[in-house]
């Protein structure tokens, strides 16, 4: 089974719409990266219904640790930096998108995170 994980910073106190927008940015950018490096995972994910899971971290440090570990594992990913036009400071890191990839590969990095 394939999935995509989106990890959102919960400490920024973004509104629901802002969080949704950041999750969408992370999802799309990670998908585009996956198309370049793992087309078989993208095909599998598309055929299985595009499962997504949205998780949370409580700091920029935690978000960067996840991003580092995702890169160590060689998974397709994205790191989202907000432009700062609405609710949060310009340049704030808001989200990481991971995959699509096999669930067991993603869970190696995300297994300790809680659902948003």
UniProtKB/Swiss-Prot annotation:
- UniProt GO cellular component terms: cytosol
Tell me the domain of life.
Archaea
Q: Which GO terms describe its molecular function?
A: peptidyl-tRNA hydrolase activity
Which major enzyme category is it?
A: hydrolase
Where found? Cytoplasm
The reaction(s) catalysed by this protein are: an N-acyl-L-alpha-aminoacyl-tRNA + H2O = an N-acyl-L-amino acid + a tRNA + H(+)
Gene Ontology biological process terms, A to Z: translation
The UniProt keyword set, sorted, is: Cytoplasm, Hydrolase
Q: What is its EC number?
A: 3.1.1.29
Hydrolase among the record's keywords? yes
- InterPro entries in alphabetical order: Pep_tRNA_hydro_II_dom_sf, Pept_tRNA_hydro_arch, PTH2
Name the predominant localization: cytoplasm
Cited function? The natural substrate for this enzyme may be peptidyl-tRNAs which drop off the ribosome during protein synthesis.
Q: Which family does it belong to?
A: Belongs to the PTH2 family.
Q: What is this protein called?
A: Peptidyl-tRNA hydrolase
Q: Which organism is it from?
A: Methanococcus maripaludis (strain C6 / ATCC BAA-1332)
Name the gene behind this protein. pth
